Amino acid sequence: MQTTINKKAHYIPDELKELKLTEYLREHLNLTGVKNGCEMRSCGACAVLIDNKTMRICHSTVKDIENCEVLTIEGMENEDGTLHPLQQAFIDYGAIQCGFCTPGMVLTAHALLLSNHAPTREQIRKALQSNLCRCTGYQQIIDAIEAASVYYK
């Protein structure tokens, strides 16, 4: 089975196709930005992009990404190793505290901004409705996404 994860081609042996995708990414590829939160696709901690769409993968298996392009938070950085402008905006606007929800929030926002380069605050809120944060509240997160949207134009 073949897939692309963070812009790199991966061949995955058949014996791993039934493995939970979160386990494969975390344990086999050391992509620990993918979190196991609620295990019910409700909190957004397990969010990644699959073919540029946000997917909650806590119930997915490796076979679900065959021939797909997968992006985790580790694949967001720029080619020179610096943070993506959206990641930097989360830092600059104080949208990170404990960090558990941050990868899912950033990837959900990235998918939104890829499809809508100038979302309204209400559109940002709606996009984040399945991402839970217990620390920051959402004001700083929305501010960060709004500020970063200029980099998507």
Locations of regions flagged by a protein language model:
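Signature of N-terminal electron-transfer/Fe-S-associated modules in redox systems
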Residues: M1-K153
